[in-house]
């Protein structure tokens, strides 16, 4: 169980300042700001566990997702410090937020969360333009086409 507490990592100074996805210094006093969301690996089991044992942290995580959305234009996929690593596919912040919302964990702007979920998921990135046009993502056009189609 202690392995579930290794990451995400708190990524702010004691006064709430942190470097955002836009590389600027921001300040938060409303929530703790985190990084190293390996959401590809954790959205299925670890984050649902957090909704049971760490509701406050779950709210902080979602508020962090929304701050990253404000600063960088999308929610994190697999972020490291103030960088989008672009090394995973999918938008796994979406099921994390949906699960928390359905469990009544909502100390964040729910309207903004819905906007961020739609914006992040419907960008014509990761082959989505092919899926919209022909119903699948051809392997000749995108790597990991089967996973991205599914």
Regions found by a protein language model. Name each.
Residues 1-31:
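Conserved oxyanion/phosphate-binding beta-strand-loop segments in alpha/beta enzyme cores
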Residues 1-12, 35, 41-58, 98-104:
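Alpha-helical support elements that line or immediately flank enzyme active sites
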Residues 8, 21-28, 55-60, 73-77:
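Phosphate-binding glycine-rich loops and adjacent basic patches that engage nucleotide phosphates
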Residues 10-17, 48-51, 59-62, 76-77, ...:
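Short, solvent-exposed loop/turn and secondary-structure capping segments
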Residues 30, 44-47, 77-82:
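Short acidic, glycine/Ser/Thr-rich loop/turn "cap" segments at secondary-structure junctions
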Residues 32-41, 86-93:
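Secondary-structure capping and boundary motifs in well-ordered enzyme cores
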Residues 57, 65-150:
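Active-site cavity-forming subdomains of large catalytic enzyme subunits
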């Amino acid at each position: 169980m202690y392995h579930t507490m290794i990451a995400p990592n708190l990524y702010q100074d004691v006064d709430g300042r942190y470097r955002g996805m836009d590389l600027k210094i921001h300040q938060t006093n409303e929530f703790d700001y985190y990084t190293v969301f390996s959401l590809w690996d954790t959205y299925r089991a670890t984050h649902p566990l957090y909704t049971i044992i760490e509701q406050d942290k779950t709210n902080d995580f979602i508020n962090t997702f929304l701050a990253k959305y404000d600063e960088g234009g999308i929610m994190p996929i697999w972020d490291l410090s103030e960088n989008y690593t672009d090394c995973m596919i999918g938008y796994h912040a979406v099921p994390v937020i949906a699960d928390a919302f359905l469990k009544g964990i909502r100390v964040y702007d729910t309207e903004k969360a819905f906007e961020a979920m739609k914006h992040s998921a419907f960008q014509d990135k990761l082959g989505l333009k092919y899926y919209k046009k022909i119903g699948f993502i051809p392997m000749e056009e995108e790597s990991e086409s089967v996973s991205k189609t599914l």
